[in-house]
């Protein structure tokens, strides 16, 4: 009989229990920081109607979503799909429940999303996202753009990274205004895509892509100069103004970006730069956009990203629900932490105690001991069976912080000792 291949599908991650424990610990610490900053936990379904997911996404998203077809229908007829992020489902959630919600709503979500991207090192097709979003009704102060970034920065500080994280921040209105001022609105979609991919390809390919869409030498020079602008507020604002493009949208974007930078400084955040390469690939962003990187490991790409979206719910309601949010890509983050050895992965054990009966005679009392430990909020297992004690203890040391050996003496005295593993 031919055996079935048991390897996981390419782009999907699975972990051994002790590694999963570290993954879960990081997820827990992120959730704790989100709560500390006033975000309330919610959950939305992993399966949504395709028309919901594609209402505003645009770009490459339609090519990347996983449609779900029932047994009796073709993929062309499928009307449901797996979510590709938490933000679009959140907008539907807001519209569905707006009469029962208080605004601004600070929402935290942690769960799996799916994208049909090409599987590669550090990138996954099934991945955990840890999101924070602030949603307003009719308006939302720029304060919350900084609030989201500060919350995410604090989350990264919670699990002992051995390298600093850096936020790269921009504002979509700046590029939109720049293109309007240069009368390049009709080529905006192409230019956004070229800029978004500019760090993933050699510089000459970026230049060639701009040539292919018919930019003049002067237009190309301005766009290339624009995307190379990064640094502090004063440097970037001056550089953009020196391009000589006048446009109200451009001015508004610069004003907003300056205000967000000032709020970040007021919140004692110094690990950020303004960077005009940051545009974000999803079309629903309208203002502030940001990505977090590990500067010493740029090859892994961003480990967090987000931005402001004014009109995400416009396809679902006439009411305005502006929002700003960000997401930590937990699988990508976990991959780089383990691959680059940027965190201590040996310290976390899945369980608190392993109860080890020497023989079957001690099984009953071992269960009593386990229940007693669980009543103290400990995670406990009993390692039963006829293996040698030494083998059982090796197993216990792998999965638990400590062990309790149960033999005849312990059963008779109803007393036991906890052996802690170093």
Q: Can you describe what each PLM-predicted range is?
A:
Residues 54-68, 186-188, 294-296, 399-407:
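Short, structured secondary-structure boundary patches
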Residues 178-185, 217, 244:
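Phosphate-rich ligand and nucleic-acid binding surfaces
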Residues 44-63, 166-181, 279-286, 388-399:
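Beta-rich nucleic-acid/ligand-interaction surfaces
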Residues 19-37, 48-49, 76-77, 85-101, ...:
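Positively charged, Gly/Ser-enriched RNA/tRNA-binding surfaces
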Residues 11, 89, 151, 174-178, ...:
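A general alpha-helix detector
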Residues 1-84, 88, 146, 150, ...:
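TRNA-binding/sensing appendages of the translation machinery
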Residues 5, 58-63, 180, 184, ...:
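Short alpha-helix boundary/capping motifs
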Residues 63-74, 183-210, 294:
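Acidic, His- and aromatic-enriched active-site or binding-groove loops in soluble protein domains
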């Amino acid at each position: 009989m031919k055996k079935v291949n048991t390897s996981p599908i390419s782009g999907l991650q699975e972990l051994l229990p002790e590694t999963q424990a570290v993954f879960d610990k990081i997820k827990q610490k992120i959730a704790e920081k989100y709560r500390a900053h006033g975000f309330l936990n919610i959950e939305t379904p992993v399966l949504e109607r395709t028309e919901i997911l594609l209402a505003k996404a645009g770009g490459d998203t339609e090519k990347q979503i996983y449609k779900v077809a029932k047994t009796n229908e073709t993929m062309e007829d499928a009307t449901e799909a797996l979510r590709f992020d938490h933000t679009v489902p959140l907008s539907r959630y807001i519209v569905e429940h707006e009469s029962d919600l208080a605004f601004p709503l600070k929402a935290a979500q942690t769960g799996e999303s799916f994208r049909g991207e090409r599987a590669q090192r550090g990138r996954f097709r099934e991945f955990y996202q840890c999101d924070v979003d602030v949603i307003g009704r009719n308006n939302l102060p720029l304060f919350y753009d900084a609030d989201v970034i500060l919350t995410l920065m604090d989350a990264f500080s919670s699990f002992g990274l051995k390298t600093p994280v850096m936020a790269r921040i921009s504002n979509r209105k700046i590029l939109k205004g720049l293109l309007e001022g240069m009368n390049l609105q009709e080529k905006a979609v192409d230019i956004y895509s070229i800029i978004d991919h500019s760090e993933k390809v050699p510089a000459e390919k970026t230049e060639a892509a701009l040539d292919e869409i018919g930019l003049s030498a002067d237009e190309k020079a301005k766009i290339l100069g624009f995307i190379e602008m990064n640094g502090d507020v004063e440097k970037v604002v001056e550089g953009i103004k020196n391009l000589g493009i006048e446009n109200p949208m451009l001015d508004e974007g610069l004003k907003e970006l300056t205000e967000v930078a000032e709020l970040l400084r007021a919140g004692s955040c110094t690990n950020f730069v303004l960077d005009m390469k940051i545009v974000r690939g999803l079309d629903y962003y309208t203002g502030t956009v940001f990505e977090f990187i590990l500067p010493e490991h740029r090859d892994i790409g961003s480990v967090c990203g987000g931005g402001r979206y004014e009109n995400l719910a416009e396809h679902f309601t006439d009411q305005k629900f502006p929002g700003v949010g960000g997401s930590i890509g937990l699988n990508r983050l976990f991959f780089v932490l383990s691959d680059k050895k940027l965190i201590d992965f040996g310290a976390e054990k899945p369980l608190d105690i392993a109860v080890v009966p020497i023989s079957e005679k001690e099984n009953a009392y071992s269960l009593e001991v386990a229940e007693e430990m669980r009543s103290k909020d400990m995670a406990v297992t009993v390692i039963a069976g006829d293996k040698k004690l030494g083998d059982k203890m090796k197993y216990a040391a792998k999965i638990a912080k400590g062990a309790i050996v149960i033999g005849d003496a312990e059963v008779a005295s109803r007393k036991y000792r906890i052996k802690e593993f170093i």
